[in-house]
């Protein structure tokens, strides 16, 4: 009996000594595993973020059909950027893409950008001739995105220099044509009379939709136009070739084209922040800064929220994806499993210079991740 008590005491002593040591080791091991898991998750998200930024660069150039980023300096942009109402309204009222998570729909849109507004600056043409010793203005080349049956608006914008006294100005827009037998080289497009008050100059818009549509249907008829804005003394107030201090006052065309919406369907996903410990597939914030890229050719936005997807897609959570689950059950070794990918993406509006120094305001599809899921 005494020996039995001794064995019991020894056994209890071993439990007391050994027990806490084992528990501490297990706790430390568990903590180390958790820390290692968090570090791996952070590194994985950082790599995913970097890959997403590089992919965005490639996508933007591809969707705008640009082989390389346009090489336009800040000084050139300052000279080319019109100081005109339509462009200022676009910049002032520009709606940088909001992170709107209230709608759970998945956007189905085209891969290439759908243009809404194109601002075309005048360019030189070998066809233009001098009339009465004055260089002609202006000739416009049009993007292939502009099709005559999709044009909803076309405005010619011209700037009139300021006057010192109240003046009546006669504005005339002439279309250059092939010389006729009687020597006529142009035909009238629009004429209007304006009353100008002393002070600053003014921008005047003129509807040229019909002329533009004719040019698009018959490109060979596009020989250019001549702009005149004569005051009562015969002085031309129209800025056609800007002089000193007249940067941004060139004439230009503002063209609006149609856009066709697409259908959508429902979907849902998780939202996380950079400090989240969530291991499942989740959407994380990511801001794209075009100035950091050195992309001065993008006028607006200078930055936008793009977001990215990261996380695990465990088969145990796949009641929502029965097809993927059945494939895995049928061939567990041959299936790579679902990936955490965007399930809802939305477009951004962008104002930019293209490779031909034209200013384009367009919608670029699938540039913002709104939802993430396993698929």
Curated annotation (Swiss-Prot):
Secretion signal, residue range per the UniProt entry: 1-23
Listed A to Z, the keywords are:
Cleavage on pair of basic residues, Cytokine, Disulfide bond, Glycoprotein, Growth factor, Heparin-binding, Secreted, Signal
Q: Where in the cell is it found?
A: Secreted
Q: Which GO terms describe its biological process?
A: cellular response to dexamethasone stimulus; muscle cell cellular homeostasis; myoblast migration involved in skeletal muscle regeneration; negative regulation of insulin receptor signaling pathway; negative regulation of myoblast differentiation; negative regulation of myoblast proliferation; negative regulation of phosphatidylinositol 3-kinase/protein kinase B signal transduction; negative regulation of satellite cell differentiation
Q: Which residues form the propeptide?
A: 24-266
What does the entry list under GO cellular component? extracellular space
Q: Which GO terms describe its molecular function?
A: cytokine activity; growth factor activity; heparin binding; identical protein binding; protein homodimerization activity; protein serine/threonine kinase activator activity
Q: List the disulfide bonds.
A: 272-282, 281-340, 309-372, 313-374
Q: Name one Pfam family in it.
A: TGFb_propeptide
Q: Which PROSITE patterns match?
A: TGF_BETA_1 (PS00250), TGF_BETA_2 (PS51362)
Site label Cleavage, positions: 98-99
Q: Which SMART domains match?
A: TGFB
Post-translational modification as stated in the protein's UniProt record: Synthesized as large precursor molecule that undergoes proteolytic cleavage to generate an N-terminal propeptide and a disulfide linked C-terminal dimer, which is the biologically active molecule. The circulating form consists of a latent complex of the C-terminal dimer and other proteins, including its propeptide, which maintain the C-terminal dimer in a latent, inactive state. Ligand activation requires additional cleavage of the prodomain by a tolloid-like metalloproteinase.
Glycosylated positions are 71
| Assembly | Homodimer; disulfide-linked. Interacts with WFIKKN2, leading to inhibit its activity. Interacts with FSTL3.
Tell me, what does this protein do in biology? Acts specifically as a negative regulator of skeletal muscle growth.
| UniProt record similarity statement | Belongs to the TGF-beta family.
Q: What is this protein called?
A: Growth/differentiation factor 8
Query: Source species, please?
Result: Sus scrofa (Pig)
In the record, what lineage is assigned to the organism producing the protein?
Answer: Eukaryota, Metazoa, Chordata, Craniata, Vertebrata
């Amino acid at each position: 009996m005494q020996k039995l008590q001794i064995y019991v005491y020894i056994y209890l002593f071993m439990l007391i000594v050994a027990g806490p040591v084992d528990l501490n080791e297990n706790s430390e091991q568990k903590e180390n595993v958790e820390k290692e898991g968090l570090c791996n998750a952070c590194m994985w998200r950082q790599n995913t973020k970097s890959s997403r930024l590089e992919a965005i660069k490639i996508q933007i150039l591809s969707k705008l059909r640009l082989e390389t980023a346009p090489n336009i300096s800040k000084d050139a942009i300052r000279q080319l950027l019109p100081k005109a109402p339509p462009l200022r309204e676009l910049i002032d009222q520009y709606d940088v893409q909001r992170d709107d998570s209230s709608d759970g729909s998945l956007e189905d849109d085209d891969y290439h950008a759908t243009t809404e507004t194109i601002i075309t600056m005048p360019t030189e043409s070998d066809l233009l001739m001098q009339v009465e010793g004055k260089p002609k203005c202006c000739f416009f080349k049009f993007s292939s995105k502009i099709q005559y049956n999709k044009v909803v608006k076309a405005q010619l914008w011209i700037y009139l220099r300021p006057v010192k006294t109240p003046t009546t100005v006669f504005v005339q827009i002439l279309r250059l044509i092939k010389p006729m037998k009687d020597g006529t080289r142009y035909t009238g497009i629009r004429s209007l009379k304006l009353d100008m008050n002393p002070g600053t100059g003014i921008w005047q818009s003129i509807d040229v939709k019909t002329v533009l549509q004719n040019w698009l249907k018959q490109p060979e008829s596009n020989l250019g136009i001549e702009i005149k804005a004569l005051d009562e003394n015969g002085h031309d107030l129209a800025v056609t070739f800007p002089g000193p201090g007249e940067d941004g006052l060139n004439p230009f065309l503002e063209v609006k084209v149609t856009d066709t919406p697409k259908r959508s369907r429902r979907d849902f996903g998780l939202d996380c922040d950079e400090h989240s410990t969530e291991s499942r597939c989740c959407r994380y914030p990511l801001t794209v800064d075009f100035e950091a890229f050195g992309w001065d050719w993008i006028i607006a936005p200078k930055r936008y929220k793009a977001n990215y997807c990261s996380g695990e897609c465990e088969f145990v959570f796949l009641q929502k994806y029965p097809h993927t689950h059945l494939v895995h059950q049928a061939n567990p070794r041959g299936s790579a499993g679902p990936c955490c990918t965007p399930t809802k993406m939305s477009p951004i509006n962008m104002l930019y210079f293209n490779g031909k120094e034209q200013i384009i305001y367009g919608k670029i599809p699938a540039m913002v991740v709104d939802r993430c899921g396993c698929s």
